[in-house]
């Protein structure tokens, strides 16, 4: 993986941990998340502090060596764009038959030996998430990555439903792409209460950091903790009740 230099910190790092920007015809620095747009680009570390610094100190003008405007709400914009990319990747994986949702289907996928990534809604109950993460660790020998950065409604969008608590992706390209976007999103998004789940996972020998995960596609991402409400769920009814407690008629 090539390294790029962040305009905010001056530090170099892997390109998949930074975000590329290009200059539009009207002089605006716009994010190029896929790093495919033509023209000269500058790179920014994928975290909120770097984005705030780049806006405040007008670092894009310095990086492009010309006057460059940028969205004042850049950190929030980048968070939204990264969430949208993650939803899109999960949706593509679903259409390719490489992603499932629903508690039972997720458990089955984890036990099948084909799963490369477990995704849990960050506002799902810590107890339910802890149990599913323990299953992933036990069946995958630490090789199944864990992502807990999307809300239940966001995860549901990828599957064409109102919400989803659990999902699993097969090992391979989609899981690798989602893991990369999750690493970048973790610099912008604050996780909901997952401290208990993370602590319990660590107590069971489960890795709490991405660099402790085995395998090229593995990642454990939760982000900083924030005391906020969670979606109530039961272990066997997690994807049948919504955040408001209303019942679902399926467990797709």
Question: Which residue stretches match the model-derived regions?
Answer:
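Helix-rich interaction surfaces within compact, conserved domain-sized segments
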Residues: 147-200, 220
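Catalytic cores of RNA-modifying enzymes
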Residues: 2-8, 33, 76, 80, ...
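Helical mechanochemical/support elements of P-loop NTPase systems and associated helical scaffolds
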Residues: 2, 41, 56, 82, ...
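Short helix-coil boundary/hinge micro-motifs
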Residues: 5-8, 114, 130-144
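Conserved nucleotide-binding/hydrolysis micro-motifs of P-loop NTPases
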Residues: 13, 49-51, 123-126, 153-154, ...
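Charge-patterned, long linear interaction tracts outside catalytic cores
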Residues: 197-252
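N-terminal cysteine/histidine-rich coordination modules
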Residues: 1-66
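Extended interfacial segments that mediate partner engagement and assembly in macromolecular machines
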Residues: 49-128
């Amino acid at each position: 993986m090539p390294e790029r230099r962040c305009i905010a910190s001056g530090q170099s790092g892997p390109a998949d941990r930074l975000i590329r920007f290009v200059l539009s015809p009207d002089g605006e620095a716009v994010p190029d998340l896929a790093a495919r747009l033509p023209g000269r680009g500058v790179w920014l570390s994928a975290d909120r502090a770097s984005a705030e610094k780049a806006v405040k100190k007008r670092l894009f003008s310095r990086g492009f060596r010309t006057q460059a405007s940028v969205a004042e709400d850049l950190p929030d914009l980048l968070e939204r764009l990264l969430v949208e990319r993650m939803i899109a990747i999960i949706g593509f994986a679903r259409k390719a038959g490489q992603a499932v949702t629903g508690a039972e289907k997720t458990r089955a996928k984890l036990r099948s030996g084909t799963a490369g990534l477990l995704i849990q809604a960050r506002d799902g109950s810590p107890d339910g998430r802890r149990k599913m993460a323990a299953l992933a660790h036990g069946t995958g020998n630490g090789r199944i990555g864990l992502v807990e950065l999307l809300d239940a409604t966001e995860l549901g969008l990828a599957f064409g439903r109102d919400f989803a608590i659990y999902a699993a992706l097969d090992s391979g390209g989609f899981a690798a792409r989602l893991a990369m976007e999750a690493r970048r999103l973790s610099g912008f998004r604050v996780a909901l209460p997952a401290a208990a789940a993370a602590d319990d996972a660590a107590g069971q020998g489960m890795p709490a950091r991405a660099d402790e995960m085995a395998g090229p596609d593995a990642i454990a991402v939760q982000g900083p903790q924030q005391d906020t409400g969670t979606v109530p769920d039961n272990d066997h009814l997690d994807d049948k009740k919504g955040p408001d407690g209303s019942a679902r008629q399926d467990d797709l």
